């Protein structure tokens, strides 16, 4: 979906009353939400943050109960469950493996076909779907932050599968919400911060890419900031970007994490990362956008609060909080 077709689904065009529906908070009952992918990095954050909140009752489903690799069984798996919100935090995320024949097919099944089935099932019940996507739907040829109205043009199979999922979700209902995230990290699962700390502790030299720019995203803050938009007085719909500005390279992000760790007394073999161009790295089969910084202005306008700078989350990312 490129160019003009995408704009039919952007910025909440299909959302009732535009970008969001505001209701009297006193009239809004506690909602029941079914969560997929609750054992993952994002799903774990959603479970942790939402579990104690009075406005939502969270019902996690395991992969054994609903397997996205079997889209034709999704409707039966949801049969008999009552819910107001379906949250899809599950995905095929093996970016490089998606370039193989089997990986490409699996990515499209999970990220594309299954996402569409979930969207249709939720819409048929009058429920909302909260679905997550990625900055990898862009080709990286811009030199300013991508907005929700910018056309997509994924470079690899993973990004293409996520783009297809976005399209199918937004076609199914104007109430559904797709949130694009980038460089996700959090306490539920190891990600880049844990990798760079482990490498710096074990090796005298650690090479990190310096010519790819995006924005880190702290998963618990995603959960905290999204809850009012799906279970609060303002219901967000359509397409949203959420990440922590400003844009940075993996090198800059990793170096700042090491700086925090060093200041906290963590023993490291190297305290200074070595820059490397992404083209010089081996083992990356999938092309990646060189620039995929996303603009979060629409999120700020709907929620009433801008996303925090990623440096504010450095102590948590470095495991010091």
Region locations from a protein language model:
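Mid/C-terminal beta-alpha module of Rossmann-like enzyme folds, strongest
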Residues: 225, 232-284
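NAD(P)H-binding glycine-rich loop region in Rossmannoid oxidoreductase-like domains
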Residues: 71-112
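Active-site "gating" loop of Rossmann-like NAD(P)-dependent oxidoreductase/epimerase domains
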Residues: 95-100, 134-155
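NAD(P)-dependent short-chain dehydrogenase/reductase
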Residues: 167-216, 220-221, 225-228
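Amphipathic terminal alpha-helices
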Residues: 15, 21, 298-300, 308-321
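N-terminal Rossmann NAD(P)H-binding glycine-rich loop of SDR-like oxidoreductase domains
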Residues: 33-51
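NAD(P)-cofactor binding segment of oxidoreductase domains
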Residues: 100-130
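Adenosine-cofactor binding site in Rossmann-like domains, unifying the SAM/SAH pocket
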Residues: 58-76
């Amino acid at each position: 979906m490129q160019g003009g077709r995408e704009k039919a689904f952007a910025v909440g065009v299909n959302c009732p009353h535009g970008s969001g529906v505001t209701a009297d908070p006193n009239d809004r009952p506690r909602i029941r939400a079914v969560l997929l992918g609750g054992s993952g990095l994002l799903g774990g954050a959603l479970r942790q943050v939402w579990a104690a909140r009075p406005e939502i009752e969270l019902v996690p489903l395991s992969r054994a109960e609903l397997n996205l690799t079997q889209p034709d069984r999704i409707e039966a798996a949801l049969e008999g469950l009552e819910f107001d919100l379906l949250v899809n935090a599950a995905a095929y995320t093996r970016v490089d493996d998606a370039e193989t024949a089997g990986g490409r097919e699996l990515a499209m099944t999970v990220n594309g076909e299954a996402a569409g089935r979930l969207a249709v099932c939720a819409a048929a019940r009058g429920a909302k779907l909260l679905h997550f996507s990625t900055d990898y739907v862009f080709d990286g040829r811009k030199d300013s932050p991508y907005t929700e109205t910018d056309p997509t043009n994924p470079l690899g199979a993973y990004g293409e599968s996520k783009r297809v999922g976005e399209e199918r979700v937004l076609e199914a209902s104007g109430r559904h919400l797709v949130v694009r995230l980038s460089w996700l990290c959090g306490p539920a699962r190891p990600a880049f911060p844990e990798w760079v700390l482990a490498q710096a502790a074990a090796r005298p030299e650690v090479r990190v890419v310096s010519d790819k720019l995006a924005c880190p995203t702290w998963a618990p803050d995603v959960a905290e900031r999204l809850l009012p938009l799906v279970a609060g007085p303002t219901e967000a719909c359509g397409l949203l970007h959420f990440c922590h500005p400003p844009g940075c390279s993996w090198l800059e992000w990793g170096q700042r994490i090491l700086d925090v760790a060093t200041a906290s007394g963590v023993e490291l073999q190297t305290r200074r990362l070595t820059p490397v161009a992404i083209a010089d790295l081996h083992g990356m089969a999938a092309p990646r956008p060189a620039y995929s910084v996303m603009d979060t202005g629409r999120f700020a306008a709907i929620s009433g609060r801008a996303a925090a700078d990623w440096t504010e989350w450095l102590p948590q990312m470095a495991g010091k909080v």
